[in-house]
Amino acid sequence: MEGDELTQNIEQWKIKRLIDNLDKARGNGTSLISLIIPPREQLPIINKMITEEYGKSSNIKSRIVRQAVQSALTSTKERLKLYNNRLPANGLILYCGEVINEEGVCEKKYTIDFQPYRAINTTLYICDNKFHTQPLKDLLVMDDKFGFIIIDGNGALFGTLQGNTREVLHKFSVDLPKKHRRGGQSALRFSRLRMESRNNYLRKVAEQSVVQFISNDKVNVAGLIIAGSAEFKNVLVQSDLFDQRLAAKVLKIVDVAYGGENGFTQAIELSADTLSNIKFIREKKVMSKFFEEVAQDTKKYCYGVEDTMRSLIMGAIEVILLFENLNFTRYVLKNPTTGAEKTLYLTPEQEENHDNFMENGEELEALEKGPLPEWIVDNYMKFGAGLEFITDRSQEGAQFVRGFGGLGAFLRYQVDMAHLNAGEEELDEEWDDDFM
């Protein structure tokens, strides 16, 4: 993956995680501030607005809510001062306020400000009991969207592929008359009826294409793939019935062995060369390569949190495969008596088990604690590794998450994981003996 693309993928991943956290947050009254400023705005005007809002907040009757709102407005104004009245090139996103728990007690104070990885066109200022994240979500769906029309003698399907997400928009079946074997006038009449049915079918497909892929008189996809198992796909594209605005967007016509959703899947795969930058295709290719390494037992792969992190730290990893929603926490723990440190990677269930934080009857001190995926994203380059994000929205990605734990890697050289693990167990036993 090229540097710019990987940087954008990392920024998108960070925004997804931020959205998850912000959507869960709740504040007291209208104490949570969502402020989004596009690059065309003037920062002094925004500062003046915040000052005026502070003055108005003195009218809030509830003392607790008033203090929370004023605290958030003060923090917002202080943060804006850091930009010296000059907005970043892509605009500014800011969230600020005190988040409360179910008992109404302040749990955490958010002050988050950053420049989005691409220019944002939305202007937003809202004080509410929740953060408003829709503009962030809109940033994530700005990948090119491609349309698919799957057409054969049994029916048609209309779908889209955007990033990792494919969607069936509409589908319908058709019962076309077969060729008539009799001769004479009967054959001519049936032939005429058959051609009329085919033309009506093509007209319906052409009309539905406009419904699905044209909005406000503009084509709403970056390109079209037409697929099918018979001549219908070629006839459709060449037909005067097919809207010329859509015809101009046809990127490729592909032969598929199936109709319907199976044909949709095959069409995505067969148009891979045309849609090479679509993440869905990339994910399938990366995962297919990984599964091939596993099947051939090349020993140039690893999977699972423990083996992958061990391989990363020893510098053996070429590319890390990271499930975007991997739910592990990284701990660095210290034995207060011996001073020995160790690193653990725990699931939420394992974090509930207090035994994981005990050693020889002593409670271990937590030196570091944080989400494992964030640590990987912040540190993978220090070990000379690359990074690929994996979703569970493709069949291969879902298999990787279910069967391989959502974390794996391609290795630079062969590593015998079984031998490596056995060696570490022997070292652990020797370490234990030293302190028995």
Swiss-Prot record:
One of its GO terms (cellular component) is cytoplasm. The keyword Cytoplasm applies. InterPro entries: eFR1_2_sf, eRF1_1_Pelota, eRF1_1_sf, eRF1_2, eRF1_3, Peptide_chain-rel_eRF1/aRF1, Ribosomal_eL30-like_sf. Keywords: Cytoplasm, Protein biosynthesis. One of its GO terms (molecular function) is translation release factor activity. Its main location: cytoplasm. It is found in: Cytoplasm. SUPFAM superfamilies: L30e-like (SSF55315), N-terminal domain of eukaryotic peptide chain release factor subunit 1, ERF1 (SSF55481), Translational machinery components (SSF53137). Heterodimer of two subunits, one of which binds GTP. Belongs to the eukaryotic release factor 1 family. Directs the termination of nascent peptide synthesis (translation) in response to the termination codons UAA and UAG. In B.musculus UGA codes for tryptophan. This is Eukaryotic peptide chain release factor subunit 1. It comes from Blepharisma musculus. The gene is eRF1.
